């Protein structure tokens, strides 16, 4: 009876958490917290579940120490969460330079926000927003203040990922005033909940590792399973791939023969630096992104991306007639009878009122966001990119470093002595820019355009060489290092995701058919036995090199967006496969196919997005550890998913595949547990809240709890049956899909990409 109640409450908790994330999307975060996460009944369910779980463990007289420690850690974590909910104080304090403040706006579930008094006062002395050199991308925020506590005075400072503590209060940088003379700090006082919760985390980390090494634990027993040593696993995997459009290079049409720069000249243009996506990068990078975003490919009719970009800059009228804008299938394409690729001039017609989709775009921003209007907005976005390029707005290739004290302006709010700003030829220049530099910035492209139109290519080449020297002299410290520049040029030359997904899927199918041949014919091909593991290693090294390049270029661990995280999952899949293939040969097939599909997803869905600066709060070692460990768990769970599909299709090998799947499942749960709660520690360090019920962390917890069910084979013997296990483990992967894709693109929260 107790077991049934526990099972019902367990499912109820999962359903409530999932429902709350969906409700949050429609009703808002405050509503979800008030009526779900913070509701008395939700807390009661957790409390009863924990109490009954403890009672059940005692009743069953569980003697495995690692199991006892693991479940005890969850009870301690829940107790800490309850203490935080009951006793913690949270709020925001607004400081202005020179004005002492001893009150803050506290969060209150009933009244919303109410003013509370602090036992000390704060007086802001200085606020500073530090920028990445030459850009308006913030590197860090910093607030310096004086703390007055009775007769005692002390100096304090907070910045992103750097907190200040006084008594039981902790202060975090949250926001700032636009005039730079005020700062908003988050304030948190939780003297009881955090120590208890952290104790639970520590015990959890110890017990998760202990679980893998405990001689009495299920994992060590699993490793001794004779089924894993058979190696007689056969698979029949049906893989379907959608039509992948390959754009064959063609020679440039006659219309473009006189509207492009020679390849060598365009390459010199691509070697210049530009301020793009809040960082300084080669113009080549901007050109590639321009082509991919507008045309959907890295080149156009045999022309390089640099030739395409320079063509639009210098021969815009000719290029406006080229079918360069890719039109996706949709209601608008059908209604307006648009081709697959349309020209810019297609959307400008005087007889139809000028901008033919302008009305639909306006309706979209007024709230009509159906599929027809969404496509109008998508096309409008591409057209705006082209228009900004033709007008020169996006060509921020002309740097200037201010040497004197200057006043910030509305157009340039962050300029001061020693800072570098990158201008376009049409930007409004501050008066502090020296006259000669101002003339050069305003006129260089006009002069360059004259030589291009006159066909004086040698002078155009000289212009680009001199412009590069000007950038080196006038850019201060804002240029990337020589190593970063070379790394980006290499990264631009080789689309790693595209090359590797084709290679890995091809080799994966070869490995799959060879495995079937080997198991049915009882014969081996020595060449493939040697070549396939080597090629897996080569693919792994190539992906490692690609990720290393992105790391060098950005200066951050390459996990900052969906594209990079897909690459990281593929990397972990291949790493695990390489480490395990000597013992279990079938893992190599998994390694090729799963990594290939992750790379395919990154290629199709993301098209290699621009590398950008990381938000200051994300620039933390704890975050890098959190994301990398979570990615490792996803990689392991993807292997259990494949085992599940195979187990359903090939029931004669269900026992072996179940044990193989569980071999991946235990370390997957360990890494996921580490990843979730290291993320909680990072959140507490960064903004003072170790668990905020964000959609991503909620679904990560749901996923952890769903997968944890199947390791309880003693209390739930039904999961010893191979078919039941495989069906459950296959369906469980839907929670991974929801955690990764559903939250990122459909739900709300700090992790959402939508």
Where does each model-flagged region fall?
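Solvent-exposed, non-transmembrane regions of integral membrane proteins
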Residues: 1-754
